[in-house]
Regions:
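Flexible, gly/pro- and Lys/Arg-enriched active-site loops
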Residues: 38, 46-54, 65-72, 76-160
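Solvent-exposed residues in well-ordered beta-strands and their adjoining turns
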Residues: 9, 62-64
Length: 160
């Protein structure tokens, strides 16, 4: 059994509708035991592409599915939502990223595959990931630093 923390975002169309769709699809997945999510927050886009604001959050999923299979599941959900990968860091109907995984004992599960790297390589530098993560996992820490302390460090260092 694994606990997945999945970043979710949308900046096209019915943004909230796409985020809710992702939650609903995960709830209906056979290997999933429970699904919870943070509140949604509006954030400016991250990266070099000019585009509209995002609605972001974190989905917490407890499931028996292995990490690469979970990646396949969320890629399928993105596809069902009409996600098109035309521009790197470009606008999207739905973006799902596995940010963090823990095993049944609460230990970090690290993955280094050609298609999946966990912990997500940029998660610790993105307030739009850390703020909703703190909501669903307030005691989270990484490399000995609490999420609240990290957020204080990031405050003012990045646009968002």
């Amino acid at each position: 059994m694994y606990t997945y923390y999945i970043g979710v975002g949308s900046n096209l169309g019915d943004r909230e509708g796409y985020l809710v769709f992702a939650v609903e699809q995960l709830v209906c997945t056979d290997s999933v035991r429970s699904v919870d999510h943070s509140s949604w927050i509006e954030t400016p886009p991250w990266g070099p592409v000019e585009q509209g604001p995002f609605l972001n959050g974190i989905i917490k999923v407890v499931a028996s599915i292995e990490p690469v299979a979970m990646l396949e599941t969320i890629l399928h959900i993105e596809c069902l939502a009409g996600r098109q990968r035309e521009i790197h860091w470009g606008p999207r109907t739905l973006d799902l990223d596995i940010v963090w995984i823990e095993d049944e004992k609460g230990h970090c599960v690290r993955v280094e595959e050609s298609t999946l790297v966990v912990p997500h390589p940029y998660f610790w530098d993105r307030r739009f990931v850390l703020e909703p993560l703190e909501e669903v996992y307030p005691n989270f820490s990484y490399e000995g630093v609490s999420i609240s302390k990290r957020l204080k460090t990031l405050h003012g260092l990045e646009v968002y």
